[in-house]
UniProtKB/Swiss-Prot annotation:
NCBIfam families named in the record: PRK05412.1 (NF003819)
Keywords: Nucleotide-binding
Family stated for the protein in its record: Belongs to the YajQ family.
Function field: Nucleotide-binding protein.
SUPFAM superfamilies: YajQ-like
One Pfam family per UniProt: DUF520
An annotated GO cellular component: cytosol
Superkingdom, natural source: Bacteria
Originating organism: Leptospira borgpetersenii serovar Hardjo-bovis (strain JB197)
Protein name from the UniProt record: Nucleotide-binding protein LBJ_2391
Single GO MF descriptor: nucleotide binding
Lineage: Bacteria, Pseudomonadati, Spirochaetota, Spirochaetia, Leptospirales
InterPro entries, alphabetized: DUF520, UPF0234-like_C, UPF0234_N, YajQ-like_sf
Length: 163
């Protein structure tokens, strides 16, 4: 039997994101302060497009969306809410929020470094946009998960592919 292992990834659950957007749109449609507003959220492949009448309403759209995402367990570090607001058609404003998928090379190295500094008896392998952690004992793997959950990365980490 092979040793227990898991993968450390940085991904967004697409169905959960779709649900969060749908719930946010439902709340925007029913809220009094959005009556008659042209506010909208569109989910595209690699980004969210937020549209509203003005910057103040756009901030409210972001607040509604962020609250729905948090309730659905989506990590907010994988979304770039700091992009600039640009004018759109019909006197509206638009913001494109980039969705980050996977870990970059530097991020995988940082995860690997933190695990190796812990001196736990596990093997760490970088596999493209993820990191595979293998160990003889499940307790060591659980300690690694606890360590990574408490680490302050500029991206969200999830744990998948438990074997």
């Amino acid at each position: 039997m092979s040793d227990p292992s898991f993968d450390v990834v940085s991904e967004i659950s697409r169905p959960e994101l779709t649900n969060a957007v749908t719930q946010a749109l439902g709340e925007i449609k029913n809220r009094f302060d959005f009556k008659g507003s042209k506010s909208d959220i569109q989910l595209e492949d690699e980004q969210l497009v937020l549209v509203s009448d003005n910057e103040a309403k756009l901030e409210s759209v972001i607040d509604v969306l962020v609250s729905k995402m948090a309730k659905r367990g989506l990590g907010l570090k994988n979304f770039d809410f700091k992009s600039k607001v640009e004018p759109a058609t019909g006197g509206t404003v638009r913001m494109k929020v980039k969705i980050r998928k996977g870990m970059e090379k530097e991020q995988t190295k940082e995860v690997t470094r933190i695990i190796k500094e812990s001196k736990l008896k596990v093997n760490v392998t970088i596999m493209g946009e993820s990191v595979r952690v293998t160990g003889k004992k499940k307790d060591d793997l659980q300690e690694v998960i606890h360590l990574l959950k408490n680490a302050d990365f500029p991206f969200d980490v999830q744990f998948t592919n438990y074997k």
